[in-house]
Amino acid sequence: MCIRDSFQAVPSQRLSYPTQLHPFNCYRHLRRINPSPYMFYVDCGDAQLVGASPETLCQIVQGKVAVHAIAGTVRRGATPQEDAALGEALLQSPKDRAEHIMLVDLARNDVNRVCDPTTTRVESLMNVEKFSHVIHLTSRITGQLRPDRTKLDALRSIFPAGTVSGAPKIRAIELVSQLEQERRGVYAGAVGRIDYAKHDLDVCIAIRTMTFKDNTAYLQAGGGIVHDSVEEDEYIE
């Protein structure tokens, strides 16, 4: 990462595989082997989306805006002792800590644009959170939506997440668009629900998401690249 006007960029790679598997059967299998906070199956007619996303893009309940940022990943251990050691090593990694704090600050600025600045909080910072196959560093950023802003204003301010684009966000997106040969489609987008009766919203980032179309399954994955990234480590992550 040698470009001076960007701290981080998140390039991704698209994979495809021919399949006769029904997408809903894939969804059922995914629920069993990889349960996640956001499980979804969306039938769009000519394409189907199957997802197991761990990351909240934007959640609004009674005017409280919340972002659940994930940055920093390591595999689960084979034993409880190895699990604990891997989680602690991730938490103490200077590179992962710096990258995580940078993305938390970006999310805080996104939330602050539509919330009362006196209410914006980092409620939790760099929690070690364990999922079925990986360990993540996670943080929660919240704020109270201003009366002159709507839930869609909040969604626009936060989208796309810095964890799948980079920082500064606009410049990182420009860099990624030069590197990736195809448009991302649903990958790194948003899937969720909007409740117009209660004015609530709960939307996740479309990561760990497959698109089924024309008997082909498409999967896309990316990773944050910073100045001191090790290529092999980032690819494995």
Task: State each model region's role.
Residues 1, 5-237:
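Extended alpha-helical targeting/anchoring segments
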